[in-house]
Amino acid sequence: MRVIGVRRALRFSPNNEEKDLAIMRAVVAPWNGEIILEEDPSLPELLTTATVVFSMARTSWALSCLDEAERLGVCVLNPPEGVRRCARSVLQRLAEASSVPVPPREGTAGWWLKRGDTAAQSRADVVFCPDRPALDRALADFRSRGIDDYLIQAHLPGDIVKFYGVLSTGFFRFFYPGDDGQSKFGDESHNGRPHHYAFSQYDLHAAASRLATAARCPIYGGDAIISPDGSFVLIDFNDWQLLPLPIGGRRGHTPVGLERGRINTQRLI
């Protein structure tokens, strides 16, 4: 069995490029897999030689290449269709249809303006707006950049929890990034240090699994906010997880919960 790992273009991993690579290395290592960047011109030819492809790719060109590989019988995880469904505006509709709790549009503590057509590539793609004038300015900036697909969500107080999992395997982990001050853009600071409010891990896992199923994205990660009463909302969801912790660190786990040298792709697709 030949296993290939496809890395995201670096612009899709702002401030986490090395951790992204570490995850992919750990995933393909049991099968001595080869890693290639999604923008590499040799990608189409290489994909035709694979049995299984673990892909973090997000560019339209790479996803089209992966579509063709799937058509030829290659198992691709995550499937390109699942990656397309991870656009924020699409996920919002899927979450609402799957009874997955997400933030309301209106609140009392400000707003988040988020680019809806793709994952954040810079700090300017996800903006905290403490008041209405700030929101209006952020919207004007989006329009000046040609961004007309966006989400507006109310800012909610509570603990930020990062989670990651793999459908159909029972593998699900979460942690509090505020415990270590780990952050991609520093946005977690708006929620302060975590209080570790009690909540149902089972319910969080179930909600994430419903969204992953709807998105056809078996290997996933995301963020949630836990309220003092134990309720939660999902504020972010991604194909794969961007793990802001050293692989093998004190919270280290095999990044996608795969046992060394064994894989059952039928359970993931």
Put a short name on every predicted segment.
Residues V3-L10, R71, P80-I160, A198, ...:
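Active-site nucleotide/adenylate-binding loops and adjacent lid/helix of ATP-dependent enzymes
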Residues G5-P104:
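Conserved N-proximal alpha/beta basic substrate-recognition cap immediately N-terminal to
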